[in-house]
């Protein structure tokens, strides 16, 4: 028993090795990013890193009140005492000379940090001299910053009244100088440095006076009679910065080994004072022999990093920058450390001042106030760097040995690398990021730093934002001037990451000629494709909606470089090269003609059939912008436009909705260019549409829609959220609004009546008569669909490329097909384009006859209009005659019908004139279905000036921006599905173990033998008549389709899990369903008899709403009929191929990975295909047909030879033809006459014939258990074994007092369990199994 328990978890991986490994190896369909994400760009980054108000300190006032030789009365100095001022002993020379020398030295010290500023000294000044100095500097500085340095060592301490001291002319008195006056003279922006005792008092007084000014300004603004109201506004003090040597109650330190102006020394000569202070801390030195005299002999220059002194200065800068970035709030760091070079230097040095002066019980003060930094751990790294440097001094000076560079930067990069390697999610940013920035321009560390920076940026947009905020941008911009080839991949990667997050850097790149760097990289054939892809992306950003960038890259030969790489094997490179081309000639005619000369459009044609949907989409985008220029055109350009349009038209049947949506946008550019031609075509189609009949909803005499009631109950349709939402029908109120807006009257003066074929609302788009604010249309879905079906799809295919003059007609047909697209986002956009032209054509039509077909197609190609389509809503009533040539007049009043309105849905009827309006999908599931609809938000204004062109604004996709998101996301990180510890991976393992258990347990039941299959384990009333039923292979979920909705049931618990509308038009029905990815993340595919295929996810999920993953027109020539086979499909999970057929003469094979049609196999018969079955291992397809024939196709062979066998033994409609999925598997087929025939595909005749009940309506064959179940019109289900022996009949429901089952409408076996689901015309769905004791 113990051994069994130990082995039981392994059973799923041991006994059924092949099946379980298959689960892991099976490809997943429709699970790529384009299916799982909304096709839109990322939210743009708020540019907090870019300094909008970068400043310079242009003027410096150096005010020294020293009065050398005379001590102020309120200061008692120690003996000995600190005497040095600017490293000068004032008593070593005469007082006046000392004062001048100190002033000159202070200026030199400041000039080290800002050599270009204008310096003015004021030595022992009077109040008037200070005023004159300050007002002069402010006047010259204008809006730039001015620095005021005040040394008050020779005057009394500041007063609590807000005064500092200066002198009278004769130096006989100390004269107070009000900080209020100083504020007035200095203005803003300014920075003040106070080096005196009690300096914190000045900071407090400054703030009080600043607040007082603000209050005075507020009073003056309220009261115009206030004296201040008549005066010029005093400057605001908000942009003023203050640095003070100590708190309000503190005195400056007087230790004789320190300079008297310790604060000034820290701010202006930080390395010198830091080294002296370090030597005074006896406990920290590694080498006791280093003296203050030795420090003065450190070789090198501060600005030369290769020397000991320069390296120390570099390390100091990196450490103080790092401390500030890690401690300060981001906005304060930006303001103090990145806005102004001199301010940044002073604040870096202020951090040192805080560290040194606090050790002498003195606390420097700043405004804005900084958090304490003197205990930060990075100071220990500084101490170590100083110690390592000083330890070498004796040997360097005495023996002349070479200086060994500090390991500081290498060690900090290692720490950064450890953070990248060993860190966890949701961590604090790495402390070393500012140090990485410091070493980018160092040749020694550059390569490693760039590599680590790239790895950091790859963590995501947050990392890019951090790097930009620390100031990385100017460094990586400067590096583009480097010619080192080894830097190319790293710089390309870093710039791709930056531009993916903040595309505004395009201007900086072009300004600094950075685009030339990337042009040379893209043109480099030795550069790996991945890096050329990133380069193509970078260049695509540079030229995106930026004319200067377009011109610069055009001159750099970008078009030719891109064209050379259109057929590169790397799909992402093909995609971005195409996007790059599309962007460079977007609204830039010079680039377009350069493309014409290089035959760019013809070279792009090959990408329209690319196996990767994103590449096809990029090619469509590029060709769309190619024809979308609004410059003057010639006959030559018109011919090119027509050729491009006809090539694009072939993509109308592309399997990817992303491609088709981009196609609509591309064609809309053509519509804009040739507006008048399309208006003419639109009028003709509208006129012709009246001649075609279309099944229309029943109407009462009052004109209200009468929905058919399928059921006595009104089930609640579940909310459907999708990238293409199933949209609500517009309400009667919005319809009335559209009638009022048009105010159309016939010439007789009577009101115009509307029909669904003429003016109607539609849920398929969101523009009101060409205005995007409302949901009303000239053309309803039904009108468009009638036009589309009247000009049949096959005729479209035959027309492509036939006549130069019929291009507009053909493109209009293409747009009609796209407006009826099964994917709502595609149809929405196409409806906008069609309605914009229809509105313009009908409202602006003159009272003249519409051109007939011959005159239209024979006319010469008209020149395009010079401007885009400008759709204006009717301002008041148009002329009465304006509708005489359109179909906007009709005698029969009908309510408009939505394309998504389920005709067979249970519903209610409203009062006459009201519209049947399911709003349920727009609200949470708890909302009542027929509650008040969504509020209309349309603007009712009739002012025509308020309506504007909208095609270019609203008819667009987010494809390019969505594609750019790839570069913003981590590319080095292991995908979550491959990470053994990720939640996704663990969920997959659990699902595969569950699958193994289901297969094993089901097989055990089947092996026991099946003697009866009539134990009813589930019975429930479905909301609609079941038409297709499908078991999920591994969960207790069953999908039941009625005409146009899907219901999901848990057959174990007997609960309804979900119910939602499939979205197919009301005259169509669901005829087939398949579970995709059933072994993992299941999707449901539905096929309708108009040839449309839809794929859903999140069904039967209580936490999420169903979403449409994709949809496409699987078969194009099908016309829905009540007696046809509809659409039949068969799904191959192993290959990702979908076989489709039905009321057509072909079997069409779709590759769901490529989202392309890969093969059309002609059936060779005149009847419909009723059943499909395939075997991926043998590449065989078996089709059962309506004429009774069974046809076998080998899809590896040429189309003319691929039909390898035809069996004509059945004489009636084939209900089911099944190809057994094993190497020697037979074909089992059944006709409505009940004859079961078994064929060996290698033999020309059947190998066995069985006879079962006649009059079959539904049939299924169990893939594992050799069971055949058939449903009859005579209200019973019969189950047979493979020998044709009847196992049992099912005629009555359990628990209903023997109620008879209805006529069987559908049935299906479970793929593994011996379970049978049966749907009948009385709405009931039931599941039967073997006896309980066997289960």
Curated annotation (Swiss-Prot):
GO molecular function list: 14-3-3 protein binding; enzyme-substrate adaptor activity; protein kinase activator activity; protein kinase binding; protein serine/threonine kinase inhibitor activity; protein-containing complex binding; protein-macromolecule adaptor activity; small GTPase binding
Cytoplasm recorded as keyword: yes
Effect of mutating residue 699 to A: Does not affect O-GlcNAcylation in response to glucose sufficiency
Tissues where the protein occurs: Highly expressed in skeletal muscle, and in a lesser extent in brain, lung, small intestine, kidney and placenta.
Region (Disordered) location: 850-943
Modified residues (Phosphoserine): 44, 122, 696, 719, 721-722, 738, 791-792, 836, 855, 859, 863, 877, 982
InterPro entries cross-referenced by the UniProt entry: ARM-like, ARM-type_fold, HEAT, Raptor, Raptor_N, WD40/YVTN_repeat-like_dom_sf, WD40_repeat_dom_sf, WD40_rpt
Signal peptide: none
Principal place of residence: membrane
Residues with PTM N6-acetyllysine: 1097
Pfam families with a match to the protein in the record: HEAT, Raptor_N, WD40
Result after altering residue 877 to A: Decreased phosphorylation, leading to increased activity of the mTORC1 complex
Glycosylation sites per record: 700
Reported impact of residue 597 to E: In alphax3 mutant; abolished interaction with GTP-bound RRAGA and recruitment to lysosomes
Listed GO biological process terms: cellular response to amino acid stimulus; cellular response to glucose stimulus; cellular response to hypoxia; cellular response to L-leucine; cellular response to nutrient levels; cellular response to osmotic stress; cellular response to starvation; DNA damage response
Keywords: Acetylation, Cytoplasm, Glycoprotein, Host-virus interaction, Isopeptide bond, Lysosome, Membrane, Phosphoprotein, Repeat, Ubl conjugation, WD repeat
Covalent cross-link (Glycyl lysine isopeptide (Lys-Gly) (interchain with G-Cter in ubiquitin)), residues: 932, 948
Cellular component terms (Gene Ontology): cytoplasm; cytoplasmic stress granule; cytosol; dendrite; lysosomal membrane; lysosome; neuronal cell body; nucleoplasm
Localization in the cell: Lysosome membrane; Cytoplasm; Cytoplasmic granule
First and last residues of every WD repeat: 1020-1061, 1065-1106, 1121-1160, 1164-1203, 1209-1249, 1251-1291, 1299-1335
Entry's family note: Belongs to the WD repeat RAPTOR family.
Subunit relationships: Part of the mechanistic target of rapamycin complex 1 (mTORC1) which contains MTOR, MLST8 and RPTOR. mTORC1 associates with AKT1S1/PRAS40, which inhibits its activity. mTORC1 associates with DEPTOR, which regulates its activity. mTORC1 binds to and is inhibited by FKBP12-rapamycin. Forms a complex with MTOR under both leucine-rich and -poor conditions. Interacts with (via TOS motifs) EIF4EBP1 and RPS6KB1; interaction is independent of its association with MTOR. (Microbial infection) Interacts with vaccinia virus protein F17; this interaction dysregulates mTOR.
Protein's recorded name: Regulatory-associated protein of mTOR
Gene: RPTOR
């Amino acid at each position: 028993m113990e051994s069994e328990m130990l082995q039981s978890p392994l059973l799923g991986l041991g006994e059924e090795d092949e099946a379980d490994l298959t689960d892991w190896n099976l490809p997943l369909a429709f699970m790529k990013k384009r299916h799982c994400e909304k096709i839109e760009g990322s939210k743009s980054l708020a540019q907090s890193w870019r300094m909008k108000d970068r400043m310079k300190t242009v003027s410096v006032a150096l005010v020294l009140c020293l009065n050398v030789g005379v001590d102020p009365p309120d200061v008692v100095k120690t003996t000995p005492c600190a005497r040095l001022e600017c490293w000068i002993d004032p008593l070593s020379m005469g007082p006046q000379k000392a004062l001048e020398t100190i002033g000159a030295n202070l200026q030199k010290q400041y000039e080290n940090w800002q050599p270009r500023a204008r310096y003015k000294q004021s030595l022992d000044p009077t109040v008037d001299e200070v005023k004159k100095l300050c007002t002069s500097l402010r006047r010259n500085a204008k809006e730039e910053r001015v620095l005021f340095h005040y040394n008050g060592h020779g005057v009394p301490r500041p007063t609590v009244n807000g005064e500092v001291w200066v002198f009278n002319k004769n130096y006989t008195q100390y004269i107070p100088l009000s900080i209020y006056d100083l504020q007035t003279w200095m203005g803003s922006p300014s920075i003040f440095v106070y080096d005196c005792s009690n300096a914190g008092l000045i900071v407090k007084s400054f703030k009080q006076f600043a607040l007082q000014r603000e209050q005075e300004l507020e009073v003056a603004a309220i009261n115009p009679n206030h004296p201040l109201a008549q005066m010029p506004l005093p400057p605001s003090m908000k942009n003023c910065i203050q640095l003070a040597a100590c708190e309000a109650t503190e005195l400056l330190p007087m230790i004789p080994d320190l300079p008297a102006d310790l604060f000034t020394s820290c701010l202006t000569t930080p390395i010198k004072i830091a080294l002296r202070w370090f030597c005074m801390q006896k406990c920290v030195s590694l080498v006791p022999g280093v003296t203050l005299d030795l420090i003065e002999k450190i070789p090198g220059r501060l600005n030369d990093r290769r020397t000991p002194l320069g390296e120390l200065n570099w390390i100091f800068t990196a450490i103080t920058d790092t401390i500030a970035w890690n401690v300060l709030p981001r906005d304060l760091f930006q303001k103090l450390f990145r806005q102004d070079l001199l301010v940044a230097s002073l604040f870096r040095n202020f951090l040192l001042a805080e560290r040194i002066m606090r050790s002498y019980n003195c606390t420097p003060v700043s405004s804005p106030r900084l958090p304490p930094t003197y205990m930060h751990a990075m100071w220990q790294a500084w101490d170590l760097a100083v110690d390592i440097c000083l330890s070498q001094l004796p040997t360097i000076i005495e023996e002349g040995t070479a200086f060994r560079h500090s390991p500081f930067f290498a060690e900090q990069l290692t720490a950064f690398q450890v953070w990248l390697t060993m860190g966890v999610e949701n961590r604090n940013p790495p402390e070393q990021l500012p140090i990485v920035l410091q070493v980018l321009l160092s040749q020694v560390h550059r390569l490693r730093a760039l590599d680590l920076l790239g790895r950091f940026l790859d963590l995501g947009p947050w990392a890019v934002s951090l790097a930009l905020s620390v100031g990385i941008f100017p460094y990586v911009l400067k590096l583009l001037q480097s010619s080192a080839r080894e830097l190319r991949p790293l710089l390309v990667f870093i710039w791709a990451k930056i531009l993916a997050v903040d595309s505004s850097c395009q201007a900086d790149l072009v300004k600094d000629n950075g685009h030339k760097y990337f042009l040379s990289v893209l043109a480099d054939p030795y550069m790996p494709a991945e890096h050329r892809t990133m380069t193509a992306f970078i260049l695509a950003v540079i030229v995106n909606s930026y004319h200067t960038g377009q011109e610069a890259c055009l001159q750099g030969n970008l078009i030719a470089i891109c064209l050379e790489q259109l057929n590169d094997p790397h799909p992402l490179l093909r995609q971005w090269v195409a996007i790059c081309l599309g962007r460079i000639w977007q609204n830039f005619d010079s680039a377009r003609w350069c493309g014409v000369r290089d035959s760019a459009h013809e070279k792009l044609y090959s990408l329209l059939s690319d196996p990767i949907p994103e590449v096809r989409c990029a090619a469509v985008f590029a060709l769309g912008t190619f024809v979308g220029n609004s410059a003057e055109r010639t006959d030559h350009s018109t011919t090119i436009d027509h050729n491009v349009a006809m090539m694009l038209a072939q993509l109308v049947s592309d399997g990817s909705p992303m491609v088709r949506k981009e196609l609509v946008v591309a064609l809309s550019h053509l519509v804009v260019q040739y507006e008048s031609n399309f208006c003419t075509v639109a009028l003709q189609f509208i006129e012709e549409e009246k001649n075609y009949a279309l099944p229309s909803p029943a109407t009462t005499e009052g004109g209200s829609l009468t929905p058919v009631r399928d059921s006595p109950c009104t089930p609640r349709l579940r909310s459907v959220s999708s990238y293409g939402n199933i949209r609500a029908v517009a309400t009667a109120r919005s319809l009335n609004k559209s009638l009022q807006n048009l105010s159309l009257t016939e010439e007789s003066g009577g009101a115009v009546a509307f029909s669904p074929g003429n003016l109607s609302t539609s849920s398929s788009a969101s523009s009101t008569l060409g205005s995007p604010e409302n949901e009303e249309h000239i053309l309803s879905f039904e009108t468009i669909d009638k036009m589309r079906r009247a000009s049949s799809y096959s005729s479209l295919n035959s027309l492509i490329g036939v006549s130069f003059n019929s291009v507009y007609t053909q493109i209009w047909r293409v747009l009609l097909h796209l407006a009826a697209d099964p994917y709502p986002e595609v149809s929405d956009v196409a409806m906008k384009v069609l309605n914009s032209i229809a509105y313009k054509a009908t409202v602006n039509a003159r009272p003249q006859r519409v051109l007939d077909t011959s005159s239209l197609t024979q006319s010469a190609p008209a020149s395009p209009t010079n401007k885009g389509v400008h759709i204006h809503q009717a301002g008041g009533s148009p002329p009465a005659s304006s509708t005489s040539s359109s179909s906007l007049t009709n005698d029969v009043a009908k309510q408009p019908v939505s394309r998504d309105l389920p005709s067979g849905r249970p519903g209610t009827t409203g009062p006459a004139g009201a519209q049947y309006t399911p709003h349920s999908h727009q609200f949470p599931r708890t909302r009542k279905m027929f509650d008040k609809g969504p509020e209309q938000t349309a603007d009712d204004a009739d002012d025509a000036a308020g309506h504007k062109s909208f095609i270019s604004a609203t008819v667009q996709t987010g494809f390019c921006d969505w594609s750019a998101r790839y570069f913003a996301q981590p590319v080095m990180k292991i995908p979550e599905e491959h990470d053994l510890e990720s939640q996704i991976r663990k969920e997959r393992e659990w699902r595969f173990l569950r699958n193994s258990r289901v297969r094993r347990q089901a097989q055990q039941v089947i092996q026991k033998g099946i003697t009866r299959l009539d134990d009813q384990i589930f019975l429930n009333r479905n909301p609609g008549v079941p038409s297709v039923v499908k078991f999920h292979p591994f969960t207790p979920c069953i999908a039941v389709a009625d005409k146009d909705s899907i219901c999901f049931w848990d057959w174990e618990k007997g609960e309804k899990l979900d119910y939602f509308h499939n979205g197919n038009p009301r005259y169509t029905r669901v005829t087939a369903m398949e579970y995709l990815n059933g072994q993992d993340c299941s999707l449901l595919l539905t096929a309708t008899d108009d040839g449309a295929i839809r794929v859903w996810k999140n069904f039967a999920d209580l936490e999420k709403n169903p979403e449409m993953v994709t949809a496409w027109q699987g078969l194009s020539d099908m016309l829905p009929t009540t007696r046809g086979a509809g659409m039949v499909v068969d799904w191959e999970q192993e290959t990702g191929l979908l076989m489709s057929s039905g009321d057509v003469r072909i079997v069409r094979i779709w590759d769901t990975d490529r989202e392309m049609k890969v093969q059309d196999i002609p059936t060779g018969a005149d009847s419909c295909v009723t059943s499909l079955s395939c075997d991926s291992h043998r590449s065989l397809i078996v089709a059962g047909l309506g004429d009774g024939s069974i046809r076998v196709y080998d899809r590896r062979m040429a189309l003319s030879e691929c039909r390898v066998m035809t069996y004509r033994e059945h004489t009636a409609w084939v209900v089911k033809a099944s190809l057994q999925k094993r190497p020697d598997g037979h074909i089992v087929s059944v006709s409505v006459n009940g004859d079961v025939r078994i064929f060996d595909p290698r033999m020309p005749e059947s190998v066995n014939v069985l006879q079962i009940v006649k009059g079959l309506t539904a049939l299924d064959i169990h893939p594992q258990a050799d069971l055949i179940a058939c449903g009859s019109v005579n209200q019973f289900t019969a189950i047979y074994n493979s020998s044709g022996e009847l196992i049992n009949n099912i005629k009555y429901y359990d628990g209903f007092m023997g109620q008879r089952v209805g006529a069987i409408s559908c049935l299906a076996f479970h793929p593994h369990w011996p379970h049978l689901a049966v749907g009948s015309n009385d709405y009931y769905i039931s599941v039967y199994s073997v006896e309980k004791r066997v289960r």
